[in-house]
Structures are given as structure tokens and as C-alpha cells.
A protein has these predicted regions:
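Structural core segment of the AMP-binding/adenylate-forming
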Residues: 3-66, 172
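Conserved pre-ATP/AMP-binding loop-to-beta segment of ANL
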Residues: 54, 59, 70-89, 96, ...
């Protein structure tokens, strides 16, 4: 419809929602009816936000009822490649959460970089995982990548390790995205489930210990594809696959990206020297109304 998407986590409360609403100047909201209270409290402090529609709402003004009353026709908007598609907010681990701005071309770029070069999905794959869609790791892995390659995705409202393994068994999942802590827990549970349909397992969001990599490979027969990504870059830009996978090592810059460790003057440092990771590629890095950045 031509709008800009700003996704939020279900765990966010009034204070965090108010900050996001004001920073992004959100004008329209879709909200789960179960979470309506926190958004309503934030809306009272956010004059830019006009209409809110709730889904999972049985009432006549709920999203489902409104959709049922609409005609089948739809007039789509054709955006330019440098039109803003979404604003993703960082987790705020280094201070106040920052809004990162991504174009329509960025959305396509992440689909044609990591999955095409490293994950290599097929149209008969079924994706699933634990990261929420408001986390760009989940947005790519559970929505954008399956759509780009004509595959399918299973979206679960809750996805602790045991339920993810149950979903693999029940739905014959072939690709999963989750965090190292989940793989560690699933390694101890895997023998209780039929996970023979699994082909690819992707990890990001935190360091993948070599012990976790080994435990999961012993339990499943699958080497975890580890990756480094960021909200600013939209998805994974360093990874490895196949014979290049080594326990404890994340990998190399994927095709389309360049990465090096530099000093404070942006000069490359010698191997083994601590520095800053500099990354360049088709995505990132635009902050929303942030002069410091």
C-alpha cells in the first residue's frame, strides 16, 4: 500500500513503544488484541499515531472483520528502489534503541546475498525458527528468504526448543533459524523427536561456542551455519557453509560484502590484533534522526 513498516517486539511496554512511535512518527498501527493495553497507553502520549486496528479481535472493528468486508480488488503502489520499506529498531544494548532505515532495494539485496550464496534454499523447503519478525534475523529467515525462493514458512507464536523440535517432526521442517542457546538445549532433546527432514540450521544473535556446534552436529548430523549480522546491515554479512564451516569460527564475508578489522584511523590491522569490524556492502547504514551517528 506504499507505507513504511515499523515492527515491534511483543515484549515491549509503554515506555519503549512510546519512544518508537515518536521517533518513527508512526501514524497507523496493527496490534494483537492481547497487547492492546500497552499500545493504548503509548498512544495517549504519541499524537502522531491516529488509527489502531487489532487482529485476533472477534469484534466488528477487528482486522479480520474489516478484511471480510473488503472487495477482492487492490490497487498496489510501485515503489522506487530507494524508497524506504522499513524502519528496524536496534535492541538498545549499547544505549538508546536506534532506528535503522532500509530501502526496498535493501530488502531484495539480503535475499540475494546470504541465502543465495550460503543457505541455498529450494522451493520445497519449509522454514521455521524462534526469532521474531521484528528482529531482522527473523524477518529475513522466516519471511523474506522463503518468499524470494518460492519456499514455505511456519510461523509459531511461541518457539522454545522443545516446541521447535516438535514442529520439525510434525511439519517436516527443513530449515531452522535460532540462537546458540536453543541449539545447545535442542542437542539434549533431539533423540526424542524425528528430525530427519532437517537440512539446514542457521545460528546468529550471539557467539556460537564450538562445544554447542559439536553437540548439535552429533545430535542431528548437521553442521550449524553460523553468521554475523546486524540490524543496521539488515541481515547476515559474514558466514560460512559446506567444507568451510569450522567450529568456533564464524566465517568470511559473503559475496556482495567486504569486511576487515581496522584501527581507530580505519587502517587494517595485523592478524591477531584487536580492532573494529568494518563492513561494506549493498545494505546499511542509515540511522533515523540520529546526529551522533
Amino acid at each position: 500500500a506504499g507505507g513504511i513498516a515499523v515492527a515491534t517486539m511483543p515484549l515491549l511496554r509503554e515506555r519503549e513503544l512510546t519512544y518508537i512511535l515518536d521517533k518513527a512518527q508512526v501514524q497507523f498501527a496493527l496490534c494483537d488484541k492481547a497487547l492492546a493495553g500497552e499500545l493504548a497507553a503509548a498512544q495517549a502520549k504519541s499524537p502522531a499515531l491516529g488509527r489502531t486496528i487489532h487482529f485476533n479481535d472477534p469484534g466488528p472493528d477487528g482486522l479480520e472483520a474489516l478484511m471480510a468486508r473488503q472487495s477482492g480488488g487492490f490497487r498496489n503502489v510501485i515503489p522506487a528502489q530507494d524508497d524506504v520499506a522499513l524502519i528496524a529498531f536496534t535492541s538498545g544494548t549499547t544505549g538508546q534503541a536506534k532506528g535503522t532505515v532500509h530501502f526496498h532495494s535493501d530488502v531484495l539485496a539480503i535475499c540475494d546475498c546470504f541465502p543465495r550464496s550460503t543457505l541455498k534454499p529450494a522451493s520445497d523447503d519449509i522454514f521455521c525458527g524462534s526469532p521474531p519478525l521484528a528482529f531482522t534475523f527473523g524477518l529475513g529467515g522466516l519471511l523474506l528468504f522463503p518468499m524470494r525462493f518460492g519456499a514455505s514458512t511456519l510461523l509459531l507464536e511461541r518457539c522454545p526448543p522443545a516446541e521447535l523440535l516438535q514442529a520439525v517432526q510434525d511439519h517436516r521442517l527443513s530449515v531452522i533459524f535460532t540462537a546458540p542457546t536453543a541449539y545447545r538445549a535442542m542437542a539434549d532433546l533431539a533423540k526424542r523427536y524425528d528430525i530427519s527432514s532437517l537440512k539446514k540450521c542457521v545460528s546468529a544473535g550471539e557467539h556460537l561456542p564450538a562445544a554447542t556446534f559439536t553437540a548439535w552436529r552429533q545430535a542431528s548430523g548437521i553442521s550449524i551455519i553460523d553468521g554475523i549480522g546486524s540490524t543496521e546491515m539488515l541481515h547476515i554479512f559474514i558466514s560460512s557453509t559446506g567444507d568451510d564451516v569450522r567450529p568456533g569460527a564464524t566465517g568470511k564475508a559473503i559475496p556482495g560484502y567486504q569486511a576487515m578489522v581496522v584501527d581507530d584511523e580505519m587502517r587494517p590491522v595485523a592478524p591477531g590484533t584487536v580492532g573494529r569490524l568494518a563492513v561494506r556492502g549493498p545494505t546499511g547504514c542509515r540511522y533515523l534522526s540520529n546526529l551522533e551517528q
